[in-house]
Structure formats: C-alpha cells, structure tokens
Amino acid sequence: ALQALAHPPVTLGTANGLSLSGQELSLALASSGSTGAPKQISITRKQMEASAKGTGSFFKTDPNSKLLCCLNPAYIAGKMMLVRAMVWNCEIHLVEPSSNPLSKVNGDFDFVAMVPLQVQASLEDEKILQKLKSIKHLIIGGAPISSKLKANLVENGIKAWQTFGMTETVSHIALAEIGKEELLYQVLPGVD
C-alpha cells in the first residue's frame, strides 16, 4: 500500500515509468557519472527484483514492515524504495525529498534510505533526532559518510548501514554497519 504525504497520491504503473507487471520491463537510466561520463544504462525487472529480495533477506523484512521513501524516484535509490515496497508487499510512505524529510512525517519506520545530508540535518534537530533513533533499519548512501557523521551516529546510538553501490549495480550490493572501528562490508545475499 502506498501512502503519500505532503503531495498527491502516487500510483505505480507505466505512466510514471515503473511497473513490475511485465516480465520484459526494463528502464533506461542515466548513471551518476562517478566512474566517468554519465551514460544511459538499461536495468531489467529481474535485476530490480533481485536487488529488493537481497536487501529484504539481509534485513529480514516482511509485509508488516513500514517504509519511508524520501529520495527522488527519478534516480535509482528512490526507484528501488518503490520496488522494495512492491516486492516485500509492505506499506510505504512518500515524502518530497528535502534536507530534513523526517520533519514531514509522524510514526516509526522499519526501513529508510537517506543520503548523508539528510542524516546530518536530522541529527541537528532534537525532535527529529528522536525520529531518526526510532528507525529500525537506516541505510545511508549516495555520497561518502564523513568521520564526523559516523561519530555522531555512534554517539547517538543510531544503528545505520553505509551502502556500497551505484546505478549500474541496481542500488547497493554491499552494506557496512556504522559503529565498528573499520567499516566491514557484507555482500547482499545473491550477489556473486
């Protein structure tokens, strides 16, 4: 079930470029350019489903899980939040991407993906910090996490994971728990 906050409801289907109804579905996406000039790549339904299943297996999600999508669905990170909700058959809440997306929501979430800027802004507001602490599984990606941000997460007792991935790998393929001295990445189930 999709629930939209702060904007009109979103219906998943071909009109907005994402549907899991066809076996031959593929999306043309632009890579980020982190490994060279941005290029168009094609990602299939099968790849998106495999990524969502690997993440779900890693975090042991179930249909009772409650997700928050606070990333732009025009990019792989936001798209994959929608795919995860469909594959995991769970509730997802959508908020317009901003530096402090938790200021726009109430309630607790089981799975949230954020970029470091969003996490840093959440740490700086005491009310929002409590919401951040209540997230069961927080993944952080899209940019490097500074040592200061890592220290703030540990100091505040926030369990979070740094991701390793890119558009070409259909989101993350490995995760490292933040809080250990050295980040040790664990490859997702099903990734060779």
Where are these regions (language model features)?
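Short beta-strand->loop structural element characteristic of the AMP-binding/adenylate-forming
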Residues: 1-12, 39-42, 91-97
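Conserved pre-ATP/AMP-binding loop-to-beta segment of ANL
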Residues: 12-30, 62-66
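Conserved S/T- and glycine-rich ATP-binding loop of Class I adenylate-forming
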Residues: 31-34, 67, 82, 112, ...
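Gly/Ser/Thr-rich phosphate-binding loop
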Residues: 126-181
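Nucleotide donor/acceptor-binding cores
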Residues: 39, 65, 136
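Conserved AMP-binding A3 loop
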Residues: 25-53, 60
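AMP-binding/adenylate-forming
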Residues: 43-50, 66-121
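Glycine-rich helix-loop-beta junction characteristic of Rossmann-like nucleotide cofactor-binding loops
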Residues: 57-62, 128-131
